[in-house]
Amino acid sequence: MSEFQLVTRFQPAGDQPEAIRQLVEGIEAGLSHQTLLGVTGSGKTFSIANVIQQVQRPTLVLAPNKTLAAQLYGEFKAFFPNNAVEYFVSYYDYYQPEAYVPSSDTFIEKDASINDHIEQMRLSATKALLERRDAIIVTTVSCIYGLGSPETYLKMVLHVDRGDKLDQRALLRRLADLQYTRNEMDFARATFRVRGDVIDIFPAESDLEAIRIELFDDEVENIAAFDPLTGEVFRKLPRFTFYPKSHYVTPRETLLEAVEGIKEELKERLEYLHKANKLVEAQRLEQRTRFDLEMILELGYCNGIENYSRYLSGRPAGAPPPTLYDYLPPDALLVIDESHVSVPQVGAMYKGDRSRKETLVEYGFRMPSALDNRPMRFDEWEDVSPQTIFVSATPGPYEAEHAGRVVEQVVRPTGLVDPQVEVRPALTQVDDLLSEIRKRVAAGERVLATTLTKRMAEDLSDYLADHDVRVRYLHSDIDTVERVEIIRDLRLGTFDVLVGINLLREGLDMPEVSLVAILDADKEGFLRSERSLIQTIGRAARNLNGRAILYADNVTGSMQRAIDETERRREKQIAFNEANGIVPKGVVKDITDIMEGATVPGARSKKRKGMAKAAEESARYEAELRTPGEITKRIKQLEEKMMQFARDLEFEAAAQLRDEIAQLRERLISS
């Protein structure tokens, strides 16, 4: 059985050795909840990796959003290259749930775009949990949403051993049951092709290997893994297990039982609606449900089949849905990153979903059983959560209430101390900030400025630009690709000042930033709470000359607590450095590292990454494009590559190609 093997050239330092020891001790003592209170840049992920290696337990890592999940995935993948590090997030690039607006009598159909690559990674994640102990699954709050039950999923699994007696037609029927499709032309994920007695199958959870089964007289003579692109055989296999294309696949007999249950509920609901004289709703419900039943009987599924999940999984009314947590072994470990954000998210999901569905049920678009197609409630999530470690620089009230032990990780391995915090009058904040920016720019350093409103951020950006400051503005309308580009440009020195509203949310990691300016710091509220202030101040904690300036006319309670906590940490860090003769060193981080994990690559997309180098060297051969026709053709080629990178979440590579396309378009106009 494989064990976790941590691969790193670093040794735990600063507060890390003691934090690792205490966390491991707490897990082995059976503590249900612990908190790792780790400051920005203290190496919390490295500490958790050491804990995982020592306790040797399958681990679920919960992040507050896809971007941070991707970063964590990249970091854990680097720490555990020989183990199963998987990525389980929502596979929707775009999702519009069905909804009804009674005030305007508007029904909005469900509309969604599924990311095929992330769907493959989700299947790979559950396969890893079912097959091996050395699994780390990095996920978001999507893990509390309904998933096919592991019992039903495992019933559908197809095992093939070398030497098995196996009729070819029976094998093809079983593959069809797993929702695999036969395709002789386009050999892609979850398809198979037949050439005489040779059957090539591309597993649903794989993006780099296909399986070849060779039959001889209804006996499995050979099983091999091969490259679906080149046909190169990697290795011979004694056996292989094929998993369904979807977590929601259901055996035929279960479908037939479900149909009977749905018919029974439909009959009861129609009686209720007729008695209430809701004739339009009754007619609508009957028409929609009977159409769905016909589709299920004919095809095995229908659009919106998840609304009948209670019957498909055999659950009683009101029971929690099967989720990713049902795939975890009993001794698993749960790590909640940025827990002050992640934990409240879990509670919010159920309420929003319930409100929308109740309207659909009331107006005859869905039956009451659709309410059981839902995320877990907060109390249900608490019941199924294994031993938990909350990880945050600013733990929230839930962590304070539940943590059996709080482990501090305040001293950084680099010896860097928290930034000095200074309070200055708000009256002259803009002019004072401008003079501070000039000092930092002269020293080759960068500045973050955070405001309260979008309008003020825009006005401040305009004002600084008018005074010859190279400034950019980061706001919610900027998509992920462009956000990565802006952050990279700041680090490269393309501009010097980044203005935003809620910069802490981005999980920014920029050692070049030496000053964080918080304007109107005394305006109490979400953006100026104690936790928000500590998080924002921490953005300057990776620079040797880090400093934070809070512009305020009054010192609020939140400000005072944030300043006191920063000062407490700073004193502890300085005392540790003096006692151990440590000279603080600045963090040196490659510019390309900023979104290392966001690529969430399989081996195939890793190979594609080499294409990004072409973007860097492109100037050399773009000069060879002479005619407008050649330039137009080149733009089309690059646009296709850019969209592929975006689909694979390789945002930096996509951003590079976008810049190149813009340059070519300028050439096209000028020519």
UniProtKB/Swiss-Prot annotation:
One Pfam family this sequence matches: UvrB_inter
Gene Ontology CC, one term: cytoplasm
Disulfide bonds: none
Motif (Beta-hairpin): 91-114
Residue ranges occupied by any Helicase C-terminal domain in the UniProt entry: 429-582
Alphabetically ordered keywords of this record: ATP-binding, Cytoplasm, DNA damage, DNA excision, DNA repair, Excision nuclease, Nucleotide-binding, SOS response
Domain Helicase ATP-binding residues, every copy: 25-412
Entry's localization field: Cytoplasm
Stored Gene3D superfamilies: 6.10.140.240, P-loop containing nucleotide triphosphate hydrolases, UVR domain
Gene Ontology biological-process entries: nucleotide-excision repair; SOS response
Span of domain UVR: 632-667
Function, as annotated: The UvrABC repair system catalyzes the recognition and processing of DNA lesions. A damage recognition complex composed of 2 UvrA and 2 UvrB subunits scans DNA for abnormalities. Upon binding of the UvrA(2)B(2) complex to a putative damaged site, the DNA wraps around one UvrB monomer. DNA wrap is dependent on ATP binding by UvrB and probably causes local melting of the DNA helix, facilitating insertion of UvrB beta-hairpin between the DNA strands. Then UvrB probes one DNA strand for the presence of a lesion.
Family note: Belongs to the UvrB family.
The name this protein goes by in its record: UvrABC system protein B
Gene that produces this protein: uvrB
